[in-house]
């Protein structure tokens, strides 16, 4: 006897995340964006600052571009849409051209 009637092994099966898998970035393709975001969060003491949210957007865009997550609308991720005429440029793209 198991000592715990009514339990089954199927109840112990892990369930996948609600929005699908979130693969690790084994090749470090988006590490730079992640580190910039984390550094920003540290500077603002983990407050929800807009400049950090825009860095998070750059990080998520990198993950989408490298097939590390599915493409999704920014509004579904709680982030502002790209400005018209921005052509999907990131903050880093804009500052790298200076």
From Swiss-Prot:
Source species of the chain: Saccharomyces cerevisiae (strain ATCC 204508 / S288c)
CC terms in the record's Gene Ontology section: cytosol; mitochondrial intermembrane space
Family, as annotated: Belongs to the COX19 family.
Organism domain of life: Eukaryota
Chain spans, region Disordered: 1-25, 76-98
UniProt-annotated location(s): Cytoplasm; Mitochondrion intermembrane space
Main location: cytoplasm
Task of the protein: Required for the assembly of mitochondrial cytochrome c oxidase.
Protein name: Cytochrome c oxidase assembly protein COX19
GO molecular function: copper ion binding
Assigned keywords, A-Z: Cytoplasm, Disulfide bond, Mitochondrion
Annotated S-S bridges: 30-62, 40-52
Bias (Polar residues) ranges: 1-10
């Amino acid at each position: 006897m198991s000592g715990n009637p009514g339990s089954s092994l199927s109840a112990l099966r892990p369930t996948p995340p609600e929005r699908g898998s979130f693969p690790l970035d084994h090749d470090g393709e988006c590490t730079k964006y992640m580190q910039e975001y984390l550094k920003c969060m540290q500077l603002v003491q983990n407050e929800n600052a807009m400049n950090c949210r825009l860095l998070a957007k750059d990080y998520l865009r990198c993950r989408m571009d490298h097939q590390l997550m599915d493409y999704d609308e920014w509004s579904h991720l709680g982030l502002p849409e790209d400005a018209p005429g921005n052509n999907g440029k990131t903050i880093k793209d804009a500052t790298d051209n200076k």
